[in-house]
UniProtKB/Swiss-Prot annotation:
Cofactor note: Binds 2 Zn(2+) ions per subunit.
Organism for this UniProt entry: Colletotrichum graminicola (strain M1.001 / M2 / FGSC 10212) (Maize anthracnose fungus)
Record lineage: Eukaryota, Fungi, Dikarya, Ascomycota, Pezizomycotina
Protein name listed in UniProt: Vacuolar membrane protease
Vacuolar side: 33-418, 492-497, 558-567, 725-736, 784-1034
Superkingdom, taxonomy of origin: Eukaryota
Region (Disordered): 623-653
GO CC annotation: vacuolar membrane
């Protein structure tokens, strides 16, 4: 009994290997995506100086309270970090100093040209001086102008911010001696430049900040412990920055411009949290050389797709990375948590919902990046390509492509390398296939696109069936892809937000549906018109499609520096080799002439048989075998006369001949020796073309191994990242149609490797997928889209009219669900709710908040709602006085226990905040008619702002003359341009309160957390949870 080929192109092996190969890659990739590597034991820890237990303890301490910049808890967290920094240095017995004047440096607006970088092979002695210097910034401030701000106001605006950053300088062996930052105000290159490691220690007012950005902060403490341990002094100096004020406008990074270390740091690693756990992804990098620093990460995770998403504007969330690169010109990496977004900026961004594994992932990967950067000299110093002298002299980098493989390997190549690869494929792959096609044609073995062939000129043409199966693949692909996309759009229309909590249910539906529809069409066509060329034609179509896509990928890489098309380079490479195998299969076939000749001979034999006078003529004329033949036993149908056929047919061959003698044409023509080998001869599969019997039946397996693994790996990793990053974007007002379209598209791409072989799959596989499809379809259509683990985010703010002593509560979110939430709140039940369109799909729903008036810090106990109108009279004070000039006004502004106020003027003004460093030349943009909005931040809530304000009216006012300038002639220019105006100045002041740590301070927020459904998450709508507004007039 013959053993079946386990790799044969038949139903059993094809079904088995399709399941095995897809399961072998889909399951691990999903597992890697959903899990986080375990913290290694002490014996296996690649960085023994990193103490995850200690870091976790620090994290639990700083996340006990909400700690936004505008809160008392924020000051406590800053003090805790200063205490921990000194404890680590004392423990490691490190010589350190503390700088009192840690900021306020005003740099020239144009830097000097940086000297050429030092030669890498030059030996120099170790830098001398204190090993560590601590900078506690309590004096820096920045003032800048623009056209949009943290309050999303329209028109020109001004911002004044006071910094409270904490910096630690770790001396490198290549750094200059001593305290080189003292007494130097020229921005020349210091040594080989330094590495900046940044994280922000403020949280949002509605979240504890465990991953945003507590893990980044405690990672910095452990990095400090690593580099201050004996034997670990870095080569290039390292600056550890714990900045404050990131959440409401990247202010902490912006005020770093006034640090004495500003021009020293030329490369950076930014640690951020845009999610609430999981793995920390390499979000983006500036160039190839910097990315190589991440190459040694123990568990690399990320690809260039995220960076291109920022570049194209598809991802709008910004981090301090934007300041370091766009404003300062540094080169570095952005490492951040990005999922689950449903917990981001909510009270579930805490240690209960985080893990030590996530902390270890960020900590170990970031230290690996920092370590590689501090060892790298010569790349991150020198003149810039853009020639911008306001920016750091960080040299220039190369565009790159990068991606991880299974969370363990990391691949990097130059973008021009990708361009060369794709361009080579575009040229070489069709030429190679054309060459093989030419050789096959010369050998007369190119069966594709061949209808008929003749052996000789006088013979009738023989059908080859070379066109059978040509149109099946595009028809099946278009129809199955269309139905798959339509199913995703159906879910979007009926239950659009199910993707929020159940993305894998949508994945299962689209994957099963595409396979099911494609199998039905391909299998049906194969049954009706069997063709041995169906697999080959599928490869030809795949080659054409991937080649066309690769043209776009190549153009994007060359013209727009977009590297995200790299998966299609892999895909086309695999398709090219697989298509080449399909062509090479034809070399095993007889030539078409030979096939036609054999077919013609067989036909002649059939004709001769049909013309014989009686059955005796059927006896072979080969006399050497006649004697061996044994006469058949007579039966009832045996003729009475030997010369007569049964049934009185008079020698005519009828259809009953085959039934009577059961002897085929091949049996008649075979010798007994040939008859013995009959069972071993290859036969065409299931009525396919006769010539296909000689096609290799095992090459399909190698084609599957070429196509499936690489396609699944590169595309599924990207698909899982994209869907995880945007599947909950509906809470931000974005239409989820993009998520559904992405899932449908990636489902099609992931299953494309199976399409050339799908018609040989067993009926039971699509039958099972049919069940999967119906179950997931019903679930996706009827299930409630949110859950306690995947909460819908709504945005909260309470607005006080301090003049009228009234309150309005605003809940912003998806209107259908926001109304359900408000109906369950004690203060909102039964009240009229007015909803107006907000951003995207969201609505701003408002109701009267008189029942839950805030008990702001000056009140020690709750007051009844019907108190006198002066309840909040002294909450915000604005004292306005005129100076000697008839148009110049002095504003004295204070707000009880608030660090931020916003002034909205009815007419454009120029302004100067007392004690400011002047207009920042980096962040300011020229304004045409002054500013109408002014945002003021202060580090000490007990010190009022004093602002000089003057109404102006001019056609064009340069940015530098709207406020105090460090240039001596700025005042004269200002006098020349302004138009004095003695009329009254009016407007509105709005101050913010963000501290909800004491229960009862903001009762409306407390009840939103307590009484909302468990599928609702409450986050901040603006800087403050409470905004108090009042009018002013001078």
């Amino acid at each position: 009994m013959a053993v079946k080929n386990p790799f044969g192109f038949t139903t059993g092996p094809v079904t088995f290997w399709l399941i095995v190969v897809y399961a072998a890659f889909l399951i691990p990739l999903v597992w890697i995506h959903e899990s986080v590597p375990a913290v290694p034991s002490s014996s296996k820890n690649p960085y023994p100086q990193l103490n995850v237990t200690e870091a976790w303890h620090d994290l639990t301490h700083i996340t006990r309270k909400y700690h936004p910049y505008n809160s008392r808890a924020n000051d406590e967290v800053g003090a805790y970090f200063m205490k921990r920094i000194e404890e680590i240095l004392v423990r490691n017995k490190v010589e350190y100093t503390k700088e009192k004047d840690a900021g306020g440096v005003i740099w020239p607006q144009e830097a000097y040209d940086a000297p050429a970088p030092a030669k890498r092979d030059v030996q120099r002695r170790d830098s001398k001086g204190p090993a560590v210097t601590i900078f506690d910034d309590t004096i820096s401030n920045t003032t800048y102008l623009g056209t949009s701000g943290s309050f999303n106001q329209a028109g020109a605006y001004g911002t004044y911010f006071e910094g409270t950053n904490k910096l630690v300088y770790i001396r490198g062996t290549l750094d200059e001696d001593g305290e080189w930052w003292n007494g130097k105000r020229d921005p020349r290159k210091i040594g080989q430049g330094g590495v900046l490691v940044n994280a922000h220690y403020d949280s949002v007012s509605s979240g504890y900040g465990a991953t945003d950005d507590g893990m980044g902060c405690v990672s910095i403490l452990q990095i400090l412990n690593h580099y201050t341990s004996p034997g670990h002094q870095p080569m290039r100096g390292i600056v550890l920055l714990l900045n404050n004020g990131e959440e409401d406008g990247l202010y902490g990074a912006k005020v770093y411009h006034y640090s004495p270390l500003y021009y020293f740091t030329t490369s950076f690693v930014n640690l951020e949290g845009a999610g609430a756990g999981g793995r920390a992804i390499l979000f983006r990098t500036t160039d190839l050389e910097v990315t190589k620093g991440y190459e040694g990460a123990p568990h690399p995770f990320g690809s260039v797709v995220a960076a291109d998403g920022f570049k194209l504007g598809a991802i709008r969330s910004e981090t301090d990375y934007k300041v370091w690169t766009e404003s300062y010109g540094q080169r570095g990496l952005d490492i951040a948590f990005y999922r689950p977004r449903a917990r981001y900026h909510t009270n579930q961004d805490d240690t209960r919902h985080a893990s030590q594994e996530s902390l270890w992932h960020m900590l170990s990967n970031s230290l690996a990046a920092v370590d590689n950067l501090q060892h790298t000299t010569g790349y991150f110093s020198g003149s810039r390509n853009d020639g911008d002298k306001k920016k750091v002299a960080s040299g220039s980098g190369t565009d790159g492509v990068w991606f991880d493989m299974f969370g363990t390997g990391f691949a990097i190549l130059e973008l021009r390398g990708l361009f060369a690869w794709t361009l080579t494929l575009l040229i070489v792959s069709p030429l190679v296939l054309a060459l093989v096609t030419y050789i096959l044609s010369r050998k007369d073995k190119y069966y594709f696109f061949s209808r008929k062939v003749t052996a000789d000129e006088d013979d009738e043409p023989v059908s080859v069936g070379g066109w059978k199966g040509f149109f099946r693949f595009p028809f099946a692909l278009v129809l199955s892809a269309s139905i798959t996309v339509l199913s995703a759009f159906l879910i979007r229309r009926v239950n659009p937000h199910i993707i929020y909590s159940s993305p894998y249910a949508v994945w299962a539906m689209t994957l099963s549906l595409f396979f099911l529809v494609f199998w039905t069409i391909a299998k049906g066509a194969s049954v009706v018109r069997p063709s041995a060329l169906q697999r080959g034609y599928a490869h030809i179509w795949l080659f054409v499609i991937s080649w066309v896509i690769l043209v776009a990928v190549t153009a994007a890489a060359d013209r727009f520096k977009i590297a995200s098309g790299y998966p299609f380079a892999f895909f086309h490479s695999a398709v090219f080799v697989s298509a080449l195998i399909s062509l090479c299969d034809l070399f095993a076939l007889p030539s078409k002439q030979e096939f036609a000749r054999n077919a013609h001979n067989d036909q002649q034999t059939r004709d001769n048989i049909s013309e014989v006078p009686n059955s005796d003529a059927l006896i072979s004329s080969r006399h050497s075998h006649v004697e061996d033949d044994v006469a058949e036993e007579p039966t009832e149908t045996t003729p009475l006369r030997s010369g007569e056929n049964g049934n009185g047919n008079n020698g005519t061959i009828r259809t009953t001949f085959a039934t009577t003698y059961r002897r085929s044409l091949s049996a008649i023509m075979r010798t007994p020796d040939e008859e013995e080998n009959k069972e071993t001869e290859q036969q065409p599969y299931d009525h396919e073309q006769q010539w296909s019997a000689n096609l290799p039946s095992w090459t399909w397996f190698f084609q599957l191994l070429l196509l499936a693994p690489i396609t699944i790996t590169v595309f599924l990793q990207i698909a899982l990242f994209i869907v995880s990053a945007i599947h909950s974007a509906a809470a931000d007002g974005n239409d989820p149609i993009l998520v559904y379209a992405a899932i449908a598209a990636f489902s099609i791409i992931i299953l494309l490797p199976a399409t050339p072989f799908i018609h040989r799959a067993s009926f039971y596989l699509p039958l099972f997928l049919l069940l999967v499809f119906f179950v997931t379809l019903i679930y996706n259509l009827v299930a409630f889209p949110f859950s306690a683990e995947n909460r819908l985010k709504v945005r909260f703010q309470q607005t006080l009219d301090l003049d009228a002593n009234t309150s309005v509560i605003s809940i912003t979110g998806l209107e259908k669900y926001t109304r359900k939430m408000i109906a369950e709140l004690p203060s909102g039940a039964g009240q009229p709710v007015n909803c107006t369109p907000g951003y995207g799909l969201t609505s701003d729903c408002r109701y009267n908040g008189a029942a839950v008036m805030p008990n702001l810090p000056q009140f020690t106990h709750a007051l009844p709602a019907n108190v006198s109108k002066g309840r909040y009279a002294n909450l915000v004070t604005v004292n306005i006085s005129r100076s000697d000039s008839s148009s110049k006004l002095e504003f004295g502004i204070d707000a009880a226990e608030s660090k931020v106020c916003n002034l909205a003027f009815d007419t454009p003004v120029s302004f100067n905040v007392r004690g400011s460093a002047g207009i920042d030349p980096i962040f300011s943009r020229p304004t045409e008619q002054g500013v109408r909005m002014l945002t003021l931040w202060r580090r000490d809530a007990s010190i009022p702002w004093v602002v000089d304000v003057e109404p102006i009216k001019t056609k064009a006012v340069p940015a530098g003359v709207l406020a105090k300038s460090s240039d001596s002639d700025a005042g004269a220019v200002h006098e020349d341009l302004r138009v004095r105006k003695s009329a009254e100045l009016s407007g509105t002041i709005a101050c913010q309160w963000s501290d909800a740590n004491v229960l009862g301070t903001i009762p409306a927020f407390d009840e939103a957390l307590q009484f909302s459904p468990d599928w609702i998450a409450v986050t901040k709508a603006s800087v403050g949870l409470v905004e108090g507004r009042k009018k002013f007039r001078a």
